[in-house]
Amino acid sequence: GDVYKRQVFVSGFTIRRDCALEFESEKFDSSLLYQMYLLAETCYKYPAAYSRVIITQAIEGGTPFFGSSESEKAIYTPGTITIDNSINFMAWYIKLQDYIAKEHNDDSNKILMLNQSKYSYPVLEIQRNKGIKVFREYARRLKEMGYAQSFYFYIYYYALIVLGAKNCRFIIKTLKHIIGHRPQL
């Protein structure tokens, strides 16, 4: 749950080397989600712990490194977050979730997909700066992929269209400050 969804966007988690080596594979190497693959596999087999103490921080801006390695260049455009980069990333996310669920014969992919929908604001917001027409097309593609499973997806979508990213970020930041943490949806 929490460990799995948070590790995608924030670095800083640690997996024991001997545990990770057991699952070494090229399956998800160029996807940018190899760390998630290792985390999922090791958490299924070994005890895991999660701490809410912040030890890393994501800073907005700068040049993204997606597509910088040779194995990623066929999937991602280096130096920018294009619509296709975002869609490819989210498609790989689904492939990985489905692979893990099939591998372990459970419905974790359905649970994770619903959770992704509930917390899809950053996934939507990252492309809002491209204009309404492009943003609507991007959101349509996410819906087709299955990311619109909760009403939260639509709240974020319409709020981003009506209020824009800057106002939405302010509202979210204010709510987190009032509540003291990210709301449990």
Predicted regions and their residues:
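Intrinsic structural disorder/low-complexity segments
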Residues: 24-25, 184
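Short, small-residue-biased leader/transition segments that mark boundaries at the very start
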Residues: 3-4
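C-terminal subregions of glycosyltransferases and related glycan-biosynthesis enzymes
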Residues: 37, 44, 53-185
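Conserved nucleotide-sugar donor-binding
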Residues: 8-24
